[in-house]
Structure formats: C-alpha cells, structure tokens
Curated annotation (Swiss-Prot):
Region (C-terminal arm, DBP binding): 440-454
GO cellular component terms listed in the entry, alphabetical order: host cell nucleus; viral capsid
The protein's name in its UniProt record: DNA-binding protein
Domain notes: The C-terminal arm bridges DBP molecules together, thereby creating a chain.
Protein's UniProt keywords contain Phosphoprotein: yes
Subunit composition and interactions: Homomultimerizes on viral ssDNA bound to pTP. Forms a initiation complex with viral polymerase, pTP and hosts NFIA and POU2F1/OCT1. Interacts with host SRCAP.
Function: Plays a role in the elongation phase of viral strand displacement replication by unwinding the template in an ATP-independent fashion, employing its capacity to form multimers. Also enhances the rate of initiation. Released from template upon second strand synthesis. Assembles in complex with viral pTP, viral pol, host NFIA and host POU2F1/OCT1 on viral origin of replication. Covers the whole ssDNA genome during synthesis. The complementary strand synthesis induces its relese from DNA template. May inhibit cellular transcription mediated by the interaction between host SRCAP and CBP.
Sites where the protein binds Zn(2+) 2: C325, C327, C378, C394
Binding positions (Zn(2+) 1): C213, H215, C268, C284
Entry GO MF terms: DNA binding; zinc ion binding
Flexible loop: annotated span: 226-260
Pfam families: Viral_DNA_bi, Viral_DNA_Zn_bi
Amino acid sequence: MSHKKVVAISESSSDEEVPVAPPTAPPKKRQRKAVEEPRGHQAMVEIARQATAALKARGDPGSIIVQTFCDQTVDVDKEGNVIFTPAKQKSICNKSGSPLASVASKIFKASEHKWQSAMEFALKVLNAYQVDHSKLTLLPDEGTLECFKKAVQAYITTSKMHVTYTFTNQKTFLHVAGRLLLDFVIKAAELAPGVNPSGCVVWQHGCQSSLMCLHGSPMIQKEQLVEMDVNSENAQRALKENPEKTKIVSNRWGRNVVQFKNEDAFCCSMDVNMSGGNFSGASCGMFYTDGPKAIMAFQQIMAFLKACYPSMPNAESHLLMPLKCECNWNSSLPLLGRQTCKITPFSLASANHIDKSEVDDQKMLATLNNPAMLVFQCCNPVYRNSKAAPQKNCDFKISSVDLVSCLQIAKQIWLSTVGEKPPVKFPEFHWSDEHRYQTTILPQGQHDDDLVLF
C-alpha cells in the first residue's frame, strides 16, 4: 500500500501577494560619552606624572607626587578612581639606635607641599581662561610656557584690550608675559628660592647723564667706521636716521656699500683696543653706535616710569630689563658671543611732527621730550640680508615701555584669577663673570648610557 503526500495549495496564492512585514530598524547605537578632561585630584596626578617624566627625560633624579596635608599620597588607578594612601612612618636612626630628624626628609616634604601649592596657583590662572594644561609641568620648558602664553592671549582677547607695540613683536610680548606668570607661581608658593623663571632683573643703570656698561664702569667714546651692504636693514636705517654721517662708496672689491663714520660711538672699557664690531673675552658686550641717542633713550624710560608711578623712589635710577632671551632662558649653558640681551636705542623720528602743546599726558610727553627708546633684542641677533652666524639666535625683541606694559598685564591677570597681589620680586643685577662675552665654546658631549661608542 503506497503512501502519497498531499500538499494543499491555496487558490489565492497565485493571484494575490502575501503581505510582507516591514523590516525592523536596526537598534540605535548609543552615543559615546565625550571623554572628560581630568579635574581635581585626577588633573593634579596627571600633571605630576608628566613632570616626573620630564625630570626623567632630562636625567634629573627624583619624582613628583601629589600629597595631602595629612601626608596621604594621592594616586589614580586604571579606572580613574582616586586612591588615598597613608604615608608610612619611617624612623631614621643613627648607629646608637636613637631616632634622628632627617633634615632632607623635611625639606622634601616641604617641597611637595609647595609644589602642590604652586600647582593650585597655576590651575587657577589657566582654568580661568579654559587653557589646556596637559603639558604643564611647572618646569621652565616649552610646554609650561605655552600654557601661560595662551592664558595671556586669552586675557587680552576676552578683555578686549588693545595693546600697542613699539619696536616689539607680539611673539616676544607673549613670551615674556608667560615667563612673568610662571615667576609669580614659583614665588607665591616659595617653591624654588633663588630661581628666577622670569629671566628679568632690575638694573641700577646710572645713565642719567653719562653711559655706564654692565660692569658698572663708564663707557669709552670711540670712533667707529662701519661698512654695510646697501640692501641690509642696518644700512637702510643708517641712511634714513643719519644721512649726514653716511655715504655710499665702493669698497676694495668694487661693491657698493654704505660707509658709516660715527664719532659718537661708545664701547665697554674692556673693548678699547678691539677693532670695530669685535669684543674681548672680558667684555660685557655693550656697544652704542650713537651715545647721545642712548642717553636720550635712558631719559625716556626714566621720565616714563616717573609719569606712571610718581611715588616710585627709584624710577630714575633703576629699570626692569630682560637679561635672557629665548636662546638661554631655560638653559644654564653659555652661548657663543653675548650672554645678555643686546640693548639698542631706537629713535622715534615720527614724534617730531607732534605738537607738544596739544599733549598734556605726562607719559606721552616722556617720549615727545625724549624721542628715543631702549629696545632689548636677542643676545646675538642676526639681521636680514646678513651672512649666517655661528651663534644661536632668535627673534626676541621688546622695548622698555612695552616691558612695563607686559608686567602690568601679568599683574592684572594674577589679581583677577588668584585674587591677591602678585609677588613681584626681581633680583637686582650685579656683574658676574658668567655674563662675560664668550669668544670660544669648548666642545661638549651628549648623554649616552652605552659603555663604548662603537
């Protein structure tokens, strides 16, 4: 008996389409939460780790940790949880077994508290202007300086302040202002006594009526004969500012040069026997091509400070000046050439066309009565259209009046963010052999952990 399988087919299957259910929508992906920047203890621990890495990269011993005032070490685990670890009590004993107070241990603990205090000051300034502090280490490095430079720029932008630069480039202005803020942080926390992150000093110049060099000695008047390329910046400035002392002649190779004969040049007393443009190993590197213009520039800054601060007792005897440029700001190694910022008097020819009777502001009259200004440049500047020089150089350039404005803005930023007056403490300049002009730099090796070179 055979079994047949019977399949029933609906009559409507061939004439009508079976309705198909719409496809289900794929499940929506959950939006990822934006990675939040570390805050509070997490931020401080992260900065401490970066500072420790920077110390290790420089080859300096030690490490930076975050510690509470109860001697608890603060750390963050892999999941981002804050961990407080009580400090272990260590007893330091001498040979007889009696406990001794370790001075070094106390100093180290005090330094940890001061570092934490300095970090709090720095974060107050940076967080007020939403500045990314991921590269902040509180060491005089590019990462730390960049953070404070951004804070200065943000303050100028948000306050809608218009800063007029006189013989100053904006890059140098922000650079010096950042150095000043870092100096305030270090000084406020008393983190590193004797360290001057600002690179600025107060100089008792003594140039009220005669020129003095950095040695504190009178400068010597010396005739100068200089030949410059016609297309160089210095030659064009000499033709414009001193047409009676310059002329275009042909040198011994038949090339047209600008010959500048100057009888009012002044040099350091250590360079009397040196030919023009050369310095001895005992020189401070100061040289003025126009002595009367230099005296006028000193009188300008004296009158300007007196107009800004009438009650300032040393306004006419001291001035603030940057001692180091970008080349040697964060380095203790000597440079080939000048070790201090080059001081050059610049004349303000356009000030002669302003009627003094229409001006009653004493700060403006200081410049109108003395149309010259001190400008601080790179220690060993290299000008355009000049031959390459072996010295390390940068484009550092800031005038004496803009340096005053730079300090004023840094004080405003500190007062508005921290809420107290900044610790304005600049060391007074005294001559030292480390400031001498270096004619030769001995070769130096680089760090290498290998026992043999090859």
